[in-house]
């Protein structure tokens, strides 16, 4: 059950990152605090992304709490790195994001996957 909570946390935090990124693109900069607050108060584009992104972080923390009660920290923490892969892939493939693909990035993703697999690889006890 710990894997379930950890993976749910990873999914939520990844979605939250994407929502917050879209919100930051749509909302005015914080240097213009009046315009920023007006956008928030009048539910302008980006407002829902900001609110749902923050909600995603909150729900992710709740799931993480449950995951840490059921998994060793060394294994649970390794699963968090899967969020980097999900956000990277979504930023490349989702329409409207226009993030470029680089082979070096794919190599980095492969190294992350190899690291997670190494941590979870069963160890034979002698």
Swiss-Prot record:
Superkingdom of origin organism: Bacteria
Secretion signal span: none
UniProt entry keywords in alphabetical sequence: Cell inner membrane, Cell membrane, Lipid A biosynthesis, Lipid biosynthesis, Lipid metabolism, Lipopolysaccharide biosynthesis, Membrane, Transmembrane, Transmembrane helix, Transport
Described function: Translocates 4-amino-4-deoxy-L-arabinose-phosphoundecaprenol (alpha-L-Ara4N-phosphoundecaprenol) from the cytoplasmic to the periplasmic side of the inner membrane.
Coiled-coil regions listed in the entry: none
Subcellular localization, as worded in the UniProt entry: Cell inner membrane
GO molecular function: carbohydrate derivative transmembrane transporter activity
Transmembrane segments: 1-21, 48-68, 77-97, 101-121
Organism lineage: Bacteria, Pseudomonadati, Pseudomonadota, Gammaproteobacteria, Enterobacterales
Species assigned in the record: Klebsiella pneumoniae subsp. pneumoniae (strain ATCC 700721 / MGH 78578)
Broad class of where this protein is predominantly found: membrane
GO biological process, one term: lipid A biosynthetic process
Subunit structure: Heterodimer of ArnE and ArnF.
Name of the featured protein: Probable 4-amino-4-deoxy-L-arabinose-phosphoundecaprenol flippase subunit ArnF
